[in-house]
């Protein structure tokens, strides 16, 4: 196994661990999920460029009669990248004591203010940063609002 193959295996493993964490483990952490909201996807073009570059590497490897293992690993990397960017939905998970946004748990006590912009972006101000949350469906903003009203403490 070459160094290139080893690097590809490491990247594929890291991406798979991230996908498993995002899809399964995050749902089980910090208690029961009270509300799950799908967010708008970002960086579609970036992934398309990444997969295109991997396609070029696959083509070069095949034309240069490179190792078949490298080709399979590149195809695997492309498939994982497509899954993470196009099949999996980014989500906002509300728990009893806080919520997961961008794979980070944020406690409700850190929220200083919440606003809704004119174009349907939920703005949550924390102590030191501002979260701009774009939901997939605008109806989900009402679900979030109702969730906060019901669970206000």
UniProtKB/Swiss-Prot annotation:
The chain crosses the membrane at residues 6-26, 45-65, 67-87. Pfam families: DUF986. It is found in: Cell inner membrane. It is a multi-pass membrane protein. Its main location: membrane. Keywords: Cell inner membrane, Cell membrane, Membrane, Transmembrane, Transmembrane helix. Signal peptide: none annotated. One of its GO terms (cellular component) is plasma membrane. Belongs to the UPF0266 family. This is UPF0266 membrane protein YPO1755/y2554/YP_1637.
């Amino acid at each position: 196994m070459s160094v290139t193959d080893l690097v590809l295996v490491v990247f594929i493993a890291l991406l798979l661990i991230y996908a498993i964490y995002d899809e399964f483990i995050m749902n089980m952490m910090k208690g029961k999920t009270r509300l799950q909201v799908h967010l708008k996807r970002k960086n579609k073009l970036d992934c398309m460029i990444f997969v295109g570059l991997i396609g070029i590497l696959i083509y070069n490897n095949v034309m240069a009669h490179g190792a078949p293992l490298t080709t399979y690993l590149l195809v695997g990397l492309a498939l994982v990248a497509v899954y993470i960017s196009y099949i999996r939905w980014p989500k906002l998970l509300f728990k009893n004591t806080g919520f997961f946004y961008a794979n980070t748990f944020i406690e409700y006590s850190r929220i200083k203010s919440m606003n809704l912009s004119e174009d349907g972006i939920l703005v949550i101000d924390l102590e030191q940063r501002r979260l701009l949350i774009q939901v997939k469906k605008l109806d989900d903003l009402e679900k979030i609002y109702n969730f906060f009203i019901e669970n206000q403490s």
